[in-house]
């Protein structure tokens, strides 16, 4: 099944500590997404001189389940659900469920 959320989409987070934050999807891994500047965690890394890693506390974005984000509708500025519409030539098109407006051309 095709994913409703793709890399580069503007999304809003529905639940969790970052509820309400908006950001761009950096990566999609199956049913999880990584959103820029959201769900930031701290990782303690050991120094590795061979790889040029200094070590210490590193902050990075952790993944969020795809069901906890909605795509932002540019017309309304709100997060909305997305569905699919099959065109006559057989292509699938992502559309907003509220308005039926096409997401990608």
Curated annotation (Swiss-Prot):
Cited NCBIfam families: rplX_bact (TIGR01079)
Record key words, sorted: Ribonucleoprotein, Ribosomal protein, RNA-binding, rRNA-binding
GO biological process terms, semicolon-separated: translation
UniProt name for this protein: Large ribosomal subunit protein uL24
Task of the protein: One of two assembly initiator proteins, it binds directly to the 5'-end of the 23S rRNA, where it nucleates assembly of the 50S subunit. One of the proteins that surrounds the polypeptide exit tunnel on the outside of the subunit.
GO MF term set: rRNA binding; structural constituent of ribosome
Family affiliation: Belongs to the universal ribosomal protein uL24 family.
SMART domains per record: KOW
Matching HAMAP family: Ribosomal_uL24_B
Subunit organization: Part of the 50S ribosomal subunit.
CDD domains: KOW_RPL26
Gene Ontology cellular component annotations, sorted alphabetically: ribonucleoprotein complex; ribosome
């Amino acid at each position: 099944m095709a994913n409703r959320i793709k890399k580069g989409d503007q999304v809003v987070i529905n639940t969790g500590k970052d509820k309400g934050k908006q950001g761009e999807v950096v990566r999609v891994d199956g049913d999880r997404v990584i959103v820029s500047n959201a769900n930031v965690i701290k990782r303690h890394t050991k120094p590795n001189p061979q790889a040029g890693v200094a070590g210490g506390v590193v902050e990075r974005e952790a993944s969020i389940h795809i069901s906890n984000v909605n795509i932002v509708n540019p017309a309304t500025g709100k997060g909305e659900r997305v569905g699919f519409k099959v065109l006559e030539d057989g292509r699938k098109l992502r559309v907003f469920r509220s308005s039926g407006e096409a997401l990608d051309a």
